[in-house]
Amino acid sequence: MKSKFKLTTAAAMLGLMVLAGGAQAQDKPREVLTGGHSVSAPQENRIYVMDSVFMHLTESRVHVYDYTNGKFLGMVPTAFNGHVQVSNDGKKIYTMTTYHERITRGKRSDVVEVWDADKLTFEKEISLPPKRVQGLNYDGLFRQTTDGKFIVLQNASPATSIGIVDVAKGDYVEDVTAAAGCWSVIPQPNRPRSFMTICGDGGLLTINLGEDGKVASQSRSKQMFSVKDDPIFIAPALDKDKAHFVSYYGNVYSADFSGDEVKVDGPWSLLNDEDKAKNWVPGGYNLVGLHRASGRMYVFMHPDGKEGTHKFPAAEIWVMDTKTKQRVARIPGRDALSMTIDQQRNLMLTLDGGNVNVYDISQPEPKLLRTIEGAAEASLQVQFHPVGGV
């Protein structure tokens, strides 16, 4: 009898708890998570750090920071070996990535994804042929035309071609097979739909797209450099109508695309006799940049260079005047591997794989403003949010 009373009492108490829980649930409506948020910093303060996370490459991501204070603003996932760029109008974030059905195996799907730049929310994906380049984050592997209408990307199957994507229509337009044997995409800022690529014969191929994104015309320059004797880095210091390339041995070659055909020039050397005696050479990934208003070019350099050190981090950053072809400043390199320049605000970002350094470059000698520490696990690319055109 006593045991029965206890069971009855327990059942009554449980019933009261359920009723109370129901009443409480009615008092507090269920929260619905819709995803996304509004990025707190203004667009002009944002920078994008492409984190390859080498130790778990299927989880690459883009970190967004406020460069003025180092605040973390958000993240965009980019799956396996992602690449990123921000649309020229600053409204969208474009990523290029690969998915496999079983993460590390299974059917492969290559896509370009479009994300809202203010909310960091996914909008759409554009299917690609399963041959987009899978490599480190060089700027020239994933670009867009100056008018912003087309994404231009590097393919490697391993045969090389360049893919054209119509962003508005969400279509893969075509393969530019004329770019076989050529590598990287260099948009020409003075033309709406033109770009160059570096070819295996030491020359440059220029492709002009029509309004439909198909090849309208093309031309090849004469040989600019010797692939065997003086190979160049694919990262250019890019002006409105000229591109400067540095070689593994510290020479500079230039390509002028102000006219109908590209005219190549060079080389001239970054090095004086003392530099040569110490074997100073360039090194890094996105290792050069140009401040267009002043004509100053920034190059990552290290001493004791030899075969195989072309990706060594910067011992120093050299500032070269491209008009006089003289060095005007040199500062500690802070082991940087990549850089980017903001033309409107006279700023430079450098990246050592994890930390981002912010410099004022309004004067010949760059001034370090701040360092954003631990910005990524393993990053080789950093970008400003576009402000005031390309």
UniProtKB/Swiss-Prot annotation:
EC numbers for this chain: 1.4.9.2
Q: What class of enzyme is it?
A: oxidoreductase
Q: Which GO terms describe its molecular function?
A: aliphatic amine dehydrogenase activity; aralkylamine dehydrogenase (azurin) activity
Q: Where, subcellularly, is it found?
A: Periplasm
UniProt catalytic activity = an aralkylamine + 2 oxidized [azurin] + H2O = an aromatic aldehyde + 2 reduced [azurin] + NH4(+) + 2 H(+)
Modified positions (Pyrrolidone carboxylic acid) are 26
UniProt keyword terms in alphabetical order: Disulfide bond, Electron transport, Oxidoreductase, Periplasm, Pyrrolidone carboxylic acid, Signal, Transport
Q: Which cysteines are joined by disulfide bonds?
A: 182-199
Q: Give the regulation of activity.
A: Irreversibly inhibited by phenylhydrazine, hydroxylamine, semicarbazide, hydrazine and aminoguanidine. Reversibly inhibited by isonicotinic acid hydrazide (isoniazid) and isonicotinic acid 2-isopropyl hydrazide (iproniazid).
Q: Where is the signal peptide?
A: 1-25
The function of this protein is: Oxidizes primary aromatic amines and, more slowly, some long-chain aliphatic amines, but not methylamine or ethylamine. Uses azurin as an electron acceptor to transfer electrons from the reduced tryptophylquinone cofactor.
Q: What does the subunit section of this Swiss-Prot or TrEMBL entry state?
A: Heterotetramer of two light and two heavy chains. Binds two azurin molecules per heterotetramer.
The entry assigns this protein to a family as follows: Belongs to the aromatic amine dehydrogenase heavy chain family.
Name of this protein: Aralkylamine dehydrogenase heavy chain
| GN (gene name) | aauB
